[in-house]
Amino acid sequence: MTETDETLIDRITDRLITAVAIGEFLPGARLPAERDLARSLGVGRTTTRAALERLVGRGILEKQRGRSGGSFVTEEWPSSEVAAVARWFEEQWPQLVDAAIAGTHLHGAIARLAASNRTDDDIERLEKRLDDFRQAESGAARQQADSILHLAIIAAAHNETLSAIVLDHERRFTIIAPAHPWGDSASRPAMEERAGREHGELVAAIVDSRVDDAGRIAQRHVEIDLELLDAARRRALTR
């Protein structure tokens, strides 16, 4: 491989390690298929495969064969990989902050429309998704329930153009879109408690057609993403 190839693999390796550090992929999670992961990362399958092999070699991932096989996360954030996370954040931090701020405004706008346009069917669906989130186990199950609830809010806006913009932005911001980063085991309980509280407030505002409240709550809620990234960045710089 050329030096450029190796440099790109280095960058993708750092990105995948950071994905584990910020809880995009939680311990025990299976990563997307190689082809899908390469598309999310914006690189070729050869580069993605080489980066995955590095993570397997470092013990962060393990390969399982068979119909239910794939690449699985083995542990949360090994202290030996702090430098990789620090490098990624140093390179990407301005763009991440910019994207996160844009995300708060996009989700605020979608929540305002949902509060204006929701139907009785939307109300029933939102309340069911909220209950599903509350009942889900901590970790990956609740991360997935969070994603499904936010998709229901987007659908309740009944605006295809803005919905497409929001979903496209999510894909640019995280490689697990439409799911969101879920932090580490130390920060997760407080984050999930806050998310549950704000979900309840947001769904109530949408159901009650409180447009301004829905927008304000959604913007504050989506700030969680940047807060999780900043916490991981600070840990990487101080460990």
Regions found by a protein language model. Name each.
Residues 1, 90-97, 111-115, 134-137, ...:
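A ubiquitous short alpha-helical element
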Residues 1-105, 236-239:
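Short linear motifs at protein or domain termini
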Residues 4, 8, 77, 98-102, ...:
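A generic short alpha-helical patch detector that favors 3-5-residue windows
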Residues 19, 23, 80, 172-180, ...:
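A short secondary-structure junction motif
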Residues 103-183, 198-199, 216-225:
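Conserved amphipathic alpha-helical segments that form helical-bundle/coiled-coil interaction surfaces
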Residues 211-239:
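C-terminal effector-binding regulatory domain of bacterial HTH transcription factors
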